[in-house]
Regions:
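Binuclear metal-dependent hydrolase catalytic cores centered on His/Asp/Glu-rich metal-binding motifs
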Residues: 122-142, 151, 156-197, 207-208, ...
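Solvent-exposed loop/turn segments at secondary-structure junctions
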Residues: 57, 85-88, 116-120, 167-169, ...
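Membrane-embedded segments
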Residues: 45, 50-145
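Conserved beta-sheet core of the metallophosphoesterase superfamily
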Residues: 203-282, 290
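Active-site-proximal beta-strand elements of phosphoester/diester hydrolases
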Residues: 46-56, 158-168, 198-201, 259-264
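N-terminal membrane-anchoring alpha-helices
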Residues: 1-43
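Beta-strand-turn-beta hairpins that frame and shape the catalytic cleft
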Residues: 39-50, 144, 151-161, 192-193, ...
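Active-site neighborhood of phospho(di)ester-bond hydrolases with catalytic His/Asp-centered motifs
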Residues: 51-53, 79-84, 109-116, 147-150, ...
Length: 300
């Protein structure tokens, strides 16, 4: 290869790298709203939910004003948290998470399912001190209903919401740990077939187990959309437990009568990369009647 051709190749590579870095910075500081419609005969009246996951202390604008504005424009009946609103980091501030949730809780009912980062705060007080207790006190003070292997029934709408917190071994890297068929039942009990059952379950890898347990709708996160998504193909590249091209990376999945909406999350941690993979807020319309599903995107 001649010197002139080599210069051309180097220039092309440099331009590609600059473009990729620009896209990464752009995608790391924006989010889209994805809108889903789900119907079921057991739902008694329409309910609009916003689903937030994996914020990891990220701020969209001053005091998260862009995120708050987007949620206000949706005008939800409730907000469902699918875990990891904060990042488990020694001596980290709780301010970003608590400030956002305080502003939201003043307007909307919030049901909060833990992710592995909230769980980690409780497991390792030697590393995180009293962060778990302070966070719990803050959420109780502003009236957030935390669902830690518990459930709440919305009688008027015919909906039952469960929040699961599974053992840390199910978050191990480099593989998926087998889960006993009775494990979820031992944590959560048995769901009622008369209610439309929503399960907030941070880790999507166990979707088949959630379906077997009896969930009608699973709300998950954790994977961050695979961090980098392959253009055109749209597949996420790597999961937090270091598996390439994870099966469950983001979007809607169906298994039998069970659907899972897997949020691509809003923030980042450890490896702060989002490429072709902006943050995501889910807008979910739960409607009475027959089967219907759909989705749309709106950038923010």
């Amino acid at each position: 290869m001649g010197a002139k051709n080599l210069d051309v190749v180097i220039t092309v590579i440099a331009v590609i790298l600059v473009v990729l870095v620009w896209i990464m910075l752009y995608d790391s500081n924006r989010f889209v709203v994805r809108h889903y419609f789900l119907r079921d005969q057991r739902i008694k009246k329409p309910v609009k939910a916003v689903v937030l996951a994996d914020l990891h202390n990220k701020r969209y604008g001053k005091e998260n004003e862009r995120l708050l504005q987007a949620i206000d424009e949706i005008r939800p009946d409730m907000i469902l948290i699918a875990g990891d609103i904060l990042t488990a980091k020694p001596k980290a501030s709780l301010e970003t998470a608590v400030d956002l949730l305080t502003k939201l809780a003043g307007k909307y009912p919030i049901y909060y399912g833990n992710g592995n980062h909230e769980h980690r705060l409780k497991l390792y007080p030697e590393n995180y001190g009293d962060m778990a207790e302070r966070y719990e006190e803050a959420l109780q003070k502003i009236g957030i209903r935390r669902l830690v292997n518990e459930h709440t029934v919305l009688e008027e709408s015919g909906i039952c919401i469960y929040g699961s917190e599974i053992d840390k071994l199910y978050y191990k890297r480099f593989g998926i740990q087998p889960m006993d068929p009775e494990y979820l039942k031992s944590l959560l009990g048995q769901p009622s077939a008369e209610k439309y059952t929503i399960l907030i379950a941070h880790n999507p890898d166990y979707f088949p187990k959630y379906a077997d347990w009896g969930a009608d709708l699973v709300l998950a996160g954790h994977v961050h959309g695979g961090m980098v998504r392959v253009p055109i193909w749209g597949k996420g590249v790597v999961s937090p437990n270091v598996r390439l091209f994870p099966k469950y990376d983001g979007g809607e999945f169906t298994l039998g009568e069970t659907r899972m909406l897997l949020s691509r999350g809003l923030g980042m941690h450890t490896i702060p990369i989002r490429l072709f993979n902006p943050g995501e807020v889910l807008e979910v319309d739960l409607l009475p009647g027959g089967e219907e599903a759909g989705g749309s995107d709106e950038g923010k």
